[in-house]
Amino acid sequence: TGLIPGLEKQFFLSSDTKGEIYFTLLDLPVSETWNLKFVLAGLTSLSFVEPTPNSQLSDSNKLYIDGMFTGRGWSSLYSIHRGLALWNNTVELRMPIAPGIFSLDFFFDVAIIKDTPRNFFTELNSNDVYYSFGPGFRFSLPQFPLRMMLANTFQVRDGKVAWQNGKGPEWQFVLSFNITNR
């Protein structure tokens, strides 16, 4: 990045790859104006940042799990764990209540962050994986693209489930924007 090489000190290549797939599981007419519909959505994104030689990156240019779009519910990670490789995966079961306006969702997220792209491929283990799941409400209006969710967060450490709070399941409120790829 940077337009002025003499003044700017951080130069890097950033790569983002995204994939989405949708399956209609059920589309049953209930009335003349409404169908009971369930859609399964699978979303994945893989991001890497590669600094140029002799360039040090500040934390503001590194990747992180933000708790709103990646690893929903993990809102405290962005300030303590940043890296140069991020893989975010989501599976959602969506039920449109008012198509194009409002739907009910259930999500399961898996987010992985590593300090370097090389370590992402060579040193990945279960302690690097952050899971979250829960129900949510999605507003699909372009003027009001909000999502309200309840998220439960955990990791699998040494083969055992470790809840984020250290005690057990705890629902956390998450407010996010409903961003669609076009």
Predicted regions and their residues:
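C-terminal outer-membrane beta-barrel translocator/porin domains of Gram-negative envelope proteins
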Residues: T1-I101, F106-R118, T122, W163, ...
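A short alpha/beta connector and helix-capping loop motif
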Residues: N119-P135
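Short beta-alpha connecting loops at secondary-structure transitions
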Residues: R118, Y130-Y131, A151, Q155-W163, ...
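Outer-membrane beta-barrel "beta-signal"
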Residues: F139-F144, K167-R182
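Short, well-ordered loop/turn and helix-capping segments at boundaries between secondary-structure elements
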Residues: T24-L25, L150, T180
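Conserved active-site loop/cleft motifs that coordinate metal ions or position small ligands
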Residues: S103-F107, P145-N152
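Short basic/hydrophobic patches in alpha-helices and adjacent helix-turn junctions
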Residues: E92-P96, P135-S140
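C-terminal beta-signal and adjacent terminal beta-strands/loops
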Residues: D109-L124, L141-Q143, F154-K160, N181
